[in-house]
Every structure is written in C-alpha cells, then in structure tokens.
Amino acid sequence: MSINDKALSDVERIKAESQGLRGTLRESLHNPVTGALAEDDVQVIKFHGIYQQDYRDLRAERHQQKLEPLYQFMARLRLPGGVLSGAQWLALGDIARTYGNASLRITSRQSIQFHGLLKPHLRPVLQALDRALLDTVSACGDVNRNVIASSAPQISAFHAEAYGWAQKIAEHLLPQSHAYHEIWLGGQQITAPEEDLLYGSTYLPRKFKIAIAVPPHNDVDVLTQDLGFIAIHEEGRLAGFNVCVGGGLGRSHNKPDTYSRLADVCGFCAPGQVLAIAEAVLITQRDHGDRSNRSHARLKYTVDRMGLDRFMEEVQQRTGFSLAPPRPFHFETSGDRFGWLENDDGTACLTLFIPGGRVADGDIPLLSGLDALARLHHGEIRLTCNQNLLIAGISPAERPVVETVLAEYGLNRLLNLAPVRAHAMACVALPTCPLAMAEAERYLPVFLDRIEALLAEVGLEGEALTVRMTGCPNGCARPYLAEIGLVGKAPGLYDLYLGGDRTGMRLNALYREALDEEALLDALRPLLKRFAGQRWAGETFGDFVRRQDLLPPDPGLPHTGRR
C-alpha cells in the first residue's frame, strides 16, 4: 500500500472541493450573523494568506456572556526576500492603524503580519495592499510559502543576487488560481475550470519553505527549510548554490514519531538550474508526501520514508540533470549585526532591534519613528529572519538626518542592548494564535529580565546566549536551534531544550519537561555556573553543554537531524 492509499485527511477533501481555492468565501464574507467563516472556508482562506483566529484573552468572558468568540483575522504578506520601499512601509502602517491593532508584526520569515482584523475589513485591507503593489497570495496554506534570503551580507551585490533569486523562485512556484483577484480585488469571475499544472487541484500535502543563505551569515537558518540554497561565491562572483533538502522543525508533544530534522546538503547546482530544482523538489513532495496524516505531511518525513538517495534520484529524473558534489562553505553566525554597517558601494545600512518583532507605539514610539524614517529615506527597508529591521542604502549625506530621527523618537535605544536580549526571539502565541499552549511574545521580555540577572549572578554578564521561545511545539521562532529553547506545554509551563549552536548548524535536545519560571531558572543556574568556571576560551554555552555531555541520550527517533 502506498502512503496515499490510506484515507485522506479532511483538509484534502476541502482543497479538492474548493473550486480552485474559492470555496464559499464570497458567501462567508457576506454573512452578517457571525464574525467567523464557514468551517471549510477557514482552511481555504489560508491559501489567500489569512488565518481565522479569536482573541483568547476574552474567550472565557464571552462564553460566560453566551457570545461567540471574538473572531479576528491575521493577514500575512507575501514578501520574497523581505524587501519594502519606504512608500510601502507607510502604507502598511496606515492599514494597521485603520483596520488592525495599530501594530505590524515582523515574522521569522521576513514578512509582516496584521493582527486584529475583523471580517468586514478583510477586503479593504487586501485592496489597500494591492494599491501598494503588495499581496498575501500563498503566504499561508499547503503551497510554497514566503521565500526568504539573507538580509545583510557585507557585499551589496551578493544581497542583490540572493534577493533576486528569492523573487524568481517565489514567482515560479506561485499558484495559478485567479481566486484571490476575483474575491478580494473585484476581478472577473472565471467559470471555466482552471488547471494548475504545478500544484494540481489539491496543492501540496503541507506547507513548503525555501531559503537562500549567503555565507558566512546564516540568518535564514537554511538547514531548517524544506529546500535550502547556500550561495557559493568564488573569485568575487556567484558560482552557484549548494542544495539542501529535508529540513523542518515542527513536532507534536507526546508524539515521538514527530521530530525536528536538519536538511541534508545534497549537491551543488549552477544558478541557471535553481528554478528546475525548486520545481522538481516541490513536485516530488506533491506526489509522494503523506496526505492522510498532516502530522507526517512535511517534506522531512517524505525524505526519511523514501530515503534521501531515492528521493534525490526522482528529483534528478525530473530535472534531467544531476547535482555536482557540494562545495565548501562556512557559517559564522545566525544572528543580526545591529547598528551601522558600511556597504561596499559607499552607502551604509542600519539594523534596528525590534522587541518581539512588534512594531507599535509604546514606551518607544517605534511605528511613528519608522514612519518618519521611511518618509525621508528613499532606499530599501529590509526585514530580517530574526524579526528585526534594516534600513539599507543610506548615503553619507542622509546619515546625520537619520541619526537625528533616531534620537528624536528614542530609536537609538534599540542599538545598544544586552546580547542575550538582542538575539532572543519569540513567536506571537497568546492571545491570538489558536495553537498556543503558553505565552511567548508577551512573556519573553519578563523571562529575559530573569536570565540577565542570572547571568550577572554567575559572572556571565554580557554573554551572548541565544534564547528562543514558542507557545507550542510547531517551532515558528526556531527554538530547536537555540542554546536555550523554551517550548510551551501548558499555561506557564515550558519544555527546556539545550545545546544548539550560534550558526544554525546543530539541533538542541530536550533537557527537562514542563517547567515553570522558577524551575527553569533552577535548572539553568548550575549549568551556567559550571559554564562560567569550566568553559574553554571562546566556547559558547551550546558547545559547552555538548562537550560536557550534559544532555540526556538521544531518544532513538528515526532521524532527528545532525546533532
């Protein structure tokens, strides 16, 4: 029996019956009785870049009042490479203030999310995005997601190449349905059947993620992707890419047959072969991925079930060529470099830390300050995969003006932070994510206060630990790569993972389960004390934990990636 001779999941039925991702969205959007969509349409709208959520802080209160949940929607941009113009940034701020919760959320995949949207506002939001030459097509759903690329290599031409390939891949793998334009933008309704030669009528078994890394920076965490391309530069030019297949971090609590996996580096391709490889890997996953069990539907499980050699044989049969042996590469960091950096073209770029990736006006008027910068600067605004923001192409004449705006709005406070805070990351979690089991974005600053105090207590003040926190085990903030990873298990309780590195090349491992804040600190204190007294020169905490063999034995999963 093949993997897909089993009974298909209900999501497969919904996709097959959706009439090219249309479903009954028109009817759902016009239904005034509820703030929600019809049940099947909740799945269909994901392919349009939108998730239905509810405001969970009010769920119990509204239930007591016999009201339906406060349904809201999250819309996510399709933004290959994470690049915006100043005018586009200003448009996003206007949309957030008019229709959302007056904030923009930078994601770990170089995109922007709007939270707090109500059903009647969805069409005006997407039309406003269209006027800004932006959209949300395929930002969610069982398709190729936002293609990410290294945001700030020191050589400007290398960034331009990586960004260019992110755009090309994104366009090449875009679904062909006209449903988005019909439903949201008033496009002509198509009654004849549509054929999508790439995706078919049921699209992919699950989401599909692609990244382009430019060594020595691995800000995209390229080995966590379904498909990764590592740029290889030789003699000052782009020679091609190492191809990485089968990464993915999401897992489920208490399901040991779900696991994190780092991608295998399978070979090297020339630039002109990139699109063919991307298409072939996607189609092979389309045809062989598990459509009966969505917990096993990602590419990493397909690769492990088929075997890497057989999987790549099929990919190469589809492309008509074989990959060359992989070429040497080296990553030095996966974090962002904050402050001013000089580019090779005479301009400068400025990287700002964005607390929790949340751009809003609070103690620091961040949204207003960035709007002011966008009005005066005509270069690019780049989003990083660490949920931060980079202003690129600042001329020597502009720099004093930019520094004046930084001081006026207090944004210069985002340039000099404790390293453990600057390199931390959290997913959104509560109160909007329906999957969250615990806090993340709202709790991380509190936990970092305690971690900073603990580091000072043991003589490690200023240590650049990587701390990542998620509200559930799906891994959106990539906690399974961190030196200290916290994964929500229940309200106030987290599984503690230790032993990742600072380059995105090694998974961490489970150390303790279901710990509250005090138990987390009690677990970390003796380890950090030991690290302070016994570390080698230049050794990181993650490397120390591994060298000292402080982690439990591997649980013996089929394949949990390179350790």
From Swiss-Prot:
UniProt GO BP: cysteine biosynthetic process; hydrogen sulfide biosynthetic process; sulfate assimilation
Residues that, per the record, bind [4Fe-4S] cluster: 427, 433, 472, 476
EC number, as in UniProt: 1.8.1.2
Pathway(s) of this molecule: Sulfur metabolism; hydrogen sulfide biosynthesis; hydrogen sulfide from sulfite (NADPH route): step 1/1
Cofactor(s) the protein needs: siroheme; [4Fe-4S] cluster
Textual note on the cofactor: Binds 1 siroheme per subunit. Binds 1 [4Fe-4S] cluster per subunit.
Short name of one Pfam family: NIR_SIR
An annotated GO cellular component: sulfite reductase complex (NADPH)
Gene3D superfamilies hit by this protein: Sulfite Reductase Hemoprotein, domain 1 (3.30.413.10)
Subunit structure: Alpha(8)-beta(8). The alpha component is a flavoprotein, the beta component is a hemoprotein.
PANTHER family, A to Z: SULFITE REDUCTASE [NADPH] SUBUNIT BETA (PTHR11493:SF47), SULFITE REDUCTASE [NADPH] SUBUNIT BETA-RELATED (PTHR11493)
Full protein name: Sulfite reductase [NADPH] hemoprotein beta-component
Organism, as annotated: Acidithiobacillus ferrooxidans (strain ATCC 23270 / DSM 14882 / CIP 104768 / NCIMB 8455)
Gene name per UniProt: cysI
